[in-house]
Amino acid sequence: MQYNFKVEAFEGPLDLLLHLIHRYEIDIYNIPVADITEQYLSYVHTMKELQLDVASEYLVMAATLLQIKSKMLLPKHEEDVLDNGDDFIDDPRQELMERLIEYKKYKQVATELKEREQERAQLYTRPPIDFTSLQQEEETSLPLDVTLYDMLAAFQKLMRRKKAKKPVTTRITRQEIPIEQRMTDILKQLKIKGGRQSFYDLFVDDEREIMVVTFLAVLELMKNQQIIIEQEHNFDEIFVSSSNKSA
């Protein structure tokens, strides 16, 4: 059964690379190409396995990373030194690094503009604020913004867990469940659990097909703002909560 699922929030390969750099606290000026390539290809493989609409530029970036990786493995010779006599040896990562830095600046500016727009809108639409609890709220650490790439990482971890627990001789009975039905089931499940549940606890079935449908249903509920995804710190467990739009 095919689930061709398009998610607009996947902004492109540079966005994925920046996510990996942030997630693994990598120095953008000294990218470990072998490690970042392995992680990048793992994400792309998972996206394709889920039948997400993977744009061609992701595959182009994959080829670029593999090319840079191969160049980094080549021995350095005297002829690699630039003709101008400088001792600097051309770094195969240089162009990618510059693109990432430029894209990071663009994202920061876009985020700042969006925040200013929201602040201006609140000046005219926001009711009077009660400041009595402001100090207490400031002292509380806010959850991280969970991206779709974080969700992919959580799904990869889940698949590894399930695979490790699954007996080799397990016989799989194929079931086909519509995404819409699974979305309804998840909302009912959250209601029974008091409105909040661990992301991993949504996957009670070990069958790969049902796990894929469940994950796509979670993404669709995220897109519809029917659920809220929370994660306190990087690599922490992800929790799913009902939103006021889920009723």
Curated annotation (Swiss-Prot):
- Domain of life, per lineage: Bacteria
Lyase found in the keyword field: no
Q: What are the BP-aspect GO terms?
A: cell division; chromosome segregation; DNA replication
Among InterPro entries, the record links this protein to:
ScpA (IPR003768), ScpA-like_C (IPR023093)
Location (main, coarse): cytoplasm
Q: How far does the signal peptide extend, from start to end residue? A: none
UniProt keyword annotations, A-Z = Cell cycle, Cell division, Chromosome partition, Cytoplasm
Please tell me one Gene Ontology term that the record gives under cellular component. Answer: cytoplasm
Which family is it part of? Belongs to the ScpA family.
Describe its partners and assembly state: Component of a cohesin-like complex composed of ScpA, ScpB and the Smc homodimer, in which ScpA and ScpB bind to the head domain of Smc. The presence of the three proteins is required for the association of the complex with DNA.
Indicate what this protein is called per its UniProt record: Segregation and condensation protein A
State the encoding gene. scpA
